[in-house]
Amino acid sequence: MATRSAKIDQKADLIWAIADKLTGVYKPHEYGDVILPLTVIRRFDCILSDTKDAVLQKYDEVKNLPMKDILLRKASKKDFYNTSKYTFERLMDDPDHIEENFREYLNKFSANVRDILEKFKFDGHITTMANKGILYIVLKEYTTDRGNLHPNEISNLEMGYIFEEIIRRFSESHNEDAGQHYTPREVIQLMVNILFYDDNDILSGNNVAKTIYDPACGTGGMLSVAEEYLHSLNASTELVSFGQEINDQTFAICKADMLIKGNNAYYIKDGNTLSDDQFAGSTFDYILSNPPFGREWKNEKAKVEEEAKLGFGGRFGAGLPAASDGQMLFLMTAISKMKDIDKGGSREICTAETEREACDNRRKVW
C-alpha cells in the first residue's frame, strides 16, 4: 500500500497555516470549517484549469441544450466542471468585488460540487469573511505556492493524503465527537487486508468490477483505503464505492474526497440509513463499516418498526434490538445487503465489545 512522503506533510502544514489569516474572526476549533471547503474548491479550481477555455467555449455552444451537463463533463475531462470566467487567480484582479465575484464563481460549478458546498454550509462563511474584511486575504493565500494544488504538483493520491491529514487535524480540534467520523487509518488497513485476503478473483483477475458499501461512511476513509489498497494489488480491477452518511459535513468531506481522488462519487448519498435507506433492495460484493455504537434509534422508531413488519423482505427480519442499540440495526442492514457467498459476497464490520456481548445475550434468548 502506498506510503506518505514528507512532501505530503509539508503541503498539509502549508495549507493549515493559511488558518492564521482567520485568527480573531474564528476560534481555533472553527478553522476547519473554512479550510476544508476552501481546500476542496482550490483543488477543483486547479484540476479544471487545463480545460477552462475549452469548457467556456463548449458552454457557449450548448448552454441551452438539455444534454449540456454530459457535454460539459466531456469538455472538462472530469466528473465536474465550472462555467464561470473566474479562477482563483482571476478573482484577485478585482478585490473590491471579491464577495460578489466569488459567489458567482461558486454558483457556476456543476451540481455535484454545489451539493458539497451546500452541505459544508460554506455560504455563511463567505459572508462572515467578507464582512470582516478577510475574504480577499484568505483567497489570495491559495494563489501562492502554498496553495498550488495542481495535479502536476500534487497527484490524486497525494492530494488524498493531504486532505486526510487536514481532516485528522480538524477532527482533533473537535475531539469531543471526532470518533464519530474518523476511524484510524491503521485500523482500516487491517480490516481491508482481511477483507481481500483470499479473494483470488479480485486480486488476480483482469478487468474485474466489484462493489463495496459502507452504511455509515463518515468521511469515506474505509471506502478510500479499500480502493487504494486494491489498486495497489491489481490495477485492472475497478471497485465502485457506495456509501451513506447522515451528517452533512462529513458527507460533504466524503464526496469531496472521492472527487479529489478522481473517483466516482455518484453513489455517495446523504441521509439517515436506518430510516431512509438510499440503496433499498441493493446488494454488494463487499461491506466494510464502523457504525456508531452507543447510539439510540428512537428518532427512527416509526420507520424502523414499519420496515420490520416486512420480516425478511426488509432489513430487520431477525427482530428489533433495544432502543439503545442502533449499532445492531446497522449490522442487520449490512447482512441484508450482502451478496450470497456463492456469488462472492464478503463483509467486515468493526463493532464495540459491548455489541458482541449483546449479541451473545440475544443468541441465548433466541
Which residues fall in each region the model found?
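Conserved Class I SAM-dependent methyltransferase catalytic core
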Residues: I15, K21, E30-V40, M191, ...
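Active-site catalytic pocket residues across diverse enzymes, especially alpha/beta-hydrolases
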Residues: L48, L230, N234, M338
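Conserved catalytic motifs of ABC-family nucleotide-binding domains
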Residues: F293-E296, E300, E306-S324
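Glycine- and acidic
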Residues: A19-D20, N148, E172-A178, I212, ...
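Hydrophobic alpha-helical scaffolding
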Residues: T128, N152, A216, G243-N247, ...
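Non-catalytic, mostly N-terminal accessory regions of nucleic-acid modification and defense proteins
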Residues: M1-D199, Y267-Q278
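Generic recognition of stable, solvent-exposed alpha-helical segments in well-folded globular domains
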Residues: Q10-A17, T39, L157, Y161, ...
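Conserved S-adenosyl-L-methionine
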Residues: H181-S289, G294-E306, T351-E353, K364
